[in-house]
């Protein structure tokens, strides 16, 4: 698509960016719905958090790993936020929301609902594995091997939590 064609559809660079963020919000919600996971914070839908099991979280985590690494749109968005987080407070906030504090808080809330002690610390460890493997995947020649290692690591963590 040429720049001219792009600007015929959008008013400005800001409009393009806002549409990208909106699409990410939609896709995030769709992923959660597809795996019967809460779409929003625990305060907004506490009953949905009560219905999640560790096995549900493992399946959802595997799907999110594929989404953030294999989906062209999501992967490009993740990489863009990683680079742009240092250029503005807005990008830093989005980076935190989508890739650091947001997911870690989400996992903590799920762990608390499941009844896991020290939920905050264990959620940080759980999400750290996801984040680490995103980076491993990006630089790997054998991406399937990294994906398999990720699944194994997540399953091991969950076994320790049971």
Question: Which stretches of residues belong to each language-model region?
Answer:
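Amphipathic alpha-helical packing segments from all-alpha helical-bundle domains
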Residues: 55, 69-115, 124
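Hydrophobic/aromatic-rich alpha-helical bundle segments in the mid-to-C-terminal region
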Residues: 93, 97, 101, 110-157
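Secondary-structure edge/capping motif, primarily at the C-terminal ends of alpha-helices
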Residues: 68, 85, 137-141
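Hydrophobic alpha-helical connector segments
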Residues: 19, 32-71, 122-126
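Helix-turn-helix
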Residues: 1-23
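Short alpha-helical scaffolding segments that buttress acidic/His motifs in well-ordered protein cores
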Residues: 61-64, 78-82, 126-133
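Hydrophobic recognition helices of helix-based DNA-binding modules
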Residues: 17-20, 24, 28, 32, ...
